Amino acid sequence: MSALPEEKSSQINASSHSINPASTNTASIQGRFISFEGTEGVGKTTAIEQLCNHLQAKGIDYLRTREPGGSPFAEQLRAILLDPDTTINDDTELLLMFAARCDHLQQVILPALQRGTWVICDRFTDSTVAYQGFGRAHGDSAVRAKIESLIRQFVVQLPELTLWLDLPVLEGMARANKRSAADRFEQQATEFFTRVHQGFSILASEQPERIQRIDASGSAEQVSQRIWQTVQEKFALS
């Protein structure tokens, strides 16, 4: 996975569970913002690659990026957050996630959208709700309220479409275990990822217009076709 955004050679203001993005001038935004979500091992990397291939075939400029990370400073925070040897409390983890996100938005995402470039992001705010709000905090309402407050204060643009790749937790973990050494999140127990999955499911039920569940079972090509059909319908692509 590349460390920094990858741009290839072309409207948005999505709502989120009673969350309005932080106030900013987004009138000049012309691009589309799509995020991918899911627990470990659901196939996001492959799915993103194949969506980008579809966009390129359509002549649509796109920028592929990720969270945590996506900008030089955010990538430094990513290294800390994913390092298995990092020992930090939950509040520190949450605030580092938002520090990385603020820089990523200002340095990478917003400039791309203002150029008319489509932004394809591997994880965004929904991962924070699912991982920190449900995985770490067991769905505690106070923690979720804290996360939503941070979104309102610091996230100036939400995705117009979020593709939640849904796969049974144990199946995803089995896939993930075939990869290289596990990072700090991948080392968590099954119960953690069960809560994360529950978080994504709740988010999808609360925001059905923005978050689309994609069945991530079957072949990569089958999943790619489900995603492309959803994107075509959302953005009226022929």
Question: Which positions does each model-derived feature cover?
Answer:
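NTP-dependent small-molecule kinase module
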Residues: 2-15, 20, 50-52, 170-238
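Pre-Walker A (Motif I) flank of P-loop NTPase domains
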Residues: 29-33
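Hydrophobic anchor at the beta1->P-loop junction of P-loop NTPases
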Residues: 36
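Walker A (P-loop) phosphate-binding loop of P-loop NTPases
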Residues: 41
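Conserved lysine of the Walker
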Residues: 44
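Hydrophobic positions on the alpha1 helix immediately C-terminal to the Walker A/P-loop
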Residues: 47
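ATP-dependent small-molecule kinase phosphotransfer cores
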Residues: 58-155
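A glycine- and Lys/Arg-enriched "phosphate-lid" helix/loop adjacent to the NTP-binding pocket
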Residues: 126-198
